[in-house]
Design a protein with these regions (language model features):
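Conserved, single-site charged/polar hotspot
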Residues: 1-166
Length: 166
């Protein structure tokens, strides 16, 4: 799959089985705050947008022509995803003010739009973009966490843990 900024993707909702076509940026606006708290620093949200975009394109490459959907909303199979209306509803139930909801949505939009043409590749291929929010002092090699093949771009590194990791 060649990266296209205005790509339309098909997302399957696990609870209903419905498949909805949407712009990839709308999808990413739903993934970023579903995978990472919108209170995090804008640079962390941008990194999440790039990783989510890369993961999406890599995943789409494995789907055949006859597949019903490109992605789903199940975080154990694809990536966590909530559409805008659902996110706003969740945030309201958590007691977020309308002002804070607007601030978070603007931040998420900025993260997605400002990284629009950015994906991560290794030797011309989209990487397997596994991610996590925090790693105290050191990351691990991917094969030690998920098993399977070693990936030269996902190796253990020292990490100076900071309290403001967001």
């Amino acid at each position: 799959i060649e990266y296209k900024a205005n790509q339309t993707i098909r997302v399957k909702y696990s609870k209903t089985g419905n498949v909805v076509a949407m712009d990839i940026n709308d999808y990413l606006r739903g993934v970023v705050p579903s995978e990472m708290p919108p209170s995090y620093n804008i640079e962390a949200l941008k990194a999440q947008a790039i990783v989510a975009r890369t993961y999406t394109y890599k995943k789409m490459m494995t789907h055949g022509e006859g597949e019903e959907a490109d992605m789903c909303d199940n975080h154990t199979h694809c990536q966590a995803f909530y559409d805008k209306d659902t996110l706003f509803s969740i945030w309201r139930k958590r007691g977020f003010s309308e002002e804070l909801i607007k601030e978070y949505w603007n931040k998420i939009n900025e993260a997605v739009v400002s990284t629009q043409n950015q994906v991560i590749t290794y030797n011309g291929e989209y990487i397997k973009a596994f991610f996590h929010a925090s790693s105290p002092y050191k990351t691990e090699n991917i094969d030690q966490i998920w098993g399977g093949e070693k990936l030269p771009y996902l190796v253990s590194v020292e990490n100076e843990e900071k309290e403001d990791y967001q």
